[in-house]
């Protein structure tokens, strides 16, 4: 039974590795591979909180912090204020902001080709896009096919070319 507080001690839970062409996509892949059944950085249990509550929650260094950061951005708290409290580098906060802004765009129902392409580049799954836009997952898959937006997979050579990567 591991404590939720994060620190320098190794934990037996919550460790993932994700590789992608952008940080945003890798972060979302990592989120999806956690055994928490979370599909989005925007969790209603945090996005519905007041700014004062979020500012207080940002002080907690635990496994919910990423969701609290995303909810804070969603609710209009400045990256500078979040940085002052968390000391998270602005580079990372900007990347999280990119994800939050895209999800806000999707929640307006926007789903033109450029928006869908950018959402996929940022690592959004068809399921999350469909839920945010308010359509079926099949509709999103049909749009991807129509607009030739297809997933790609790359092989990662974990043996430094000692053996042929397959």
Where do the model's predicted regions map?
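ATP-dependent carboxylate/acyl-activation modules
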Residues: 1-166
């Amino acid at each position: 039974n591991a404590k939720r507080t994060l620190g320098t001690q190794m934990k037996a839970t919550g460790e993932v590795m994700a590789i992608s062409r952008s940080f945003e996509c890798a972060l979302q892949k990592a989120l999806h591979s956690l055994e928490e059944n979370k599909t989005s950085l925007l969790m209603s249990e945090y996005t519905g909180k007041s700014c004062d509550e979020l500012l207080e929650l940002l002080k907690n260094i635990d496994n919910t912090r990423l969701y609290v950061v995303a909810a804070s951005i969603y609710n209009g708290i400045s990256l500078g204020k979040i940085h002052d409290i968390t000391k998270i580098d602005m580079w990372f906060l900007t990347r999280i902001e990119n994800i939050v802004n895209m999800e806000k765009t999707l929640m307006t129902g926007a789903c033109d080709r450029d928006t869908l392409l950018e959402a996929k580049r940022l690592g959004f799954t068809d399921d999350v896009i469909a839920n945010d836009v308010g359509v079926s997952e099949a509709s999103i898959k049909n749009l991807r096919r129509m607009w030739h937006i297809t997933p790609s997979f790359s092989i990662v050579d974990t043996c430094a070319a000692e053996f042929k990567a397959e």
